[in-house]
Amino acid sequence: MSDITVANYHAFPDARGHFGRYGGRFVAETLIGPLQELAQAYDAARHDPDFIAAYNKDLKDYVGRPSPIYHAERLSRKVGGAQILLKREDLNHTGAHKINNTIGQALLAARMGKTRIIAETGAGQHGVASATVAARLGLECVVYMGATDIERQQINVYRMKLLGATVVPVTSGSATLKDALNEAMRDWVTHVGHTFYIIGTVAGPDPYPRMVRDFNAIVGREARAQMIEDYGRLPDAMTACVGGGSNAIGLFHAFLNDASVRIYGAEAAGDGIATGRHAASIVAGRPGVLHGNRTYVICDDDGQILETHSVSAGLDYPGVGPEHAFLADSGRVQYVGIRDEEALAAFHLLAHTEGILAALESSHAVAHAMTLARDLPKDALVLCNLSGRGDKDVHTIAAREGVRV
């Protein structure tokens, strides 16, 4: 990691959409115009009090915000050490943080006069959230999803269809999130006149990384205020899972300038970094270009993107949002790899001690929160973003454990 001094983390990205040496717009010429149109529309909307009021009203009345911070007392006692606090994004409408972003982008799509939205999805939560807001606003919705992910997330596939969306299986490459994003990009280029592409993570070409971050930043703003109100101080440490990194940057952003708060991103180490079967782009990747932005990617010596693995479909992605790459290089956020078996153990322990089924993605963060707690005193506070609920993963976990459901 390079030696970077940053006075204000909220000053990024710059006017060209760069977070230090990461980000930007590495796209075909045919997409430059649509991206400029989108950036102009977003910049106008985010300064429009009426748009902000409509967004905030939907967060309150439709999503059900604010989400609470829950003190996992029995889990904390079982683990030993610090107190583990959970930011309960799993309690949102549709069951994850994803709807914070899709509400904002769908309102922007309607403002721009678009009649059709498309989305990519891995675990299916972003697809469900996109289909949900499309139904509410009367927009056509098409969701691209890797065939591998369709097999392991059939409940969410059916949920999308119930909401009126068309789910398009993607069989190219590893048939996972990366490939779904590729197909969605191709669709957007072809139908840009009436189509709005709702990217689900803080990746892609500018303005997507900053736009998705801004729509998810409500998580961190709420958490900061809740910590001060309920505990009289900020947490000592916090963690969130990182695939593309939308839930993580949503939590982290409000705390980036608070030097007293240690921040950790939990990437998917899969079967272990040494095996090569993982999706830990920062821990084990290198700088490169993927899906329109410069960031950390998992690739070979020739820059070719490699296949990834994670028990969690939502973390099974060979890149990461460019702001995370920048935060890693600056040293502000530390990124660690959590193996499948560690995430599964955390899933079960949280279920047994607190009666909460966490998404497998979120379980990576819970696993690291437990590790952090063990090394801290009893009065320390560790905040963990519980980004989604685990109903969607029950079949996957049962199959791994030889249980027929």
UniProtKB/Swiss-Prot annotation:
One of its GO terms (cellular component) is cytoplasm. It catalyses: (1S,2R)-1-C-(indol-3-yl)glycerol 3-phosphate + L-serine = D-glyceraldehyde 3-phosphate + L-tryptophan + H2O. Pathway: Amino-acid biosynthesis; L-tryptophan biosynthesis; L-tryptophan from chorismate: step 5/5. One of its GO terms (molecular function) is tryptophan synthase activity. It holds the Pfam family PALP. NCBIfam families: trpB (TIGR00263). Belongs to the TrpB family. This is Tryptophan synthase beta chain. It comes from Xylella fastidiosa (strain M12).
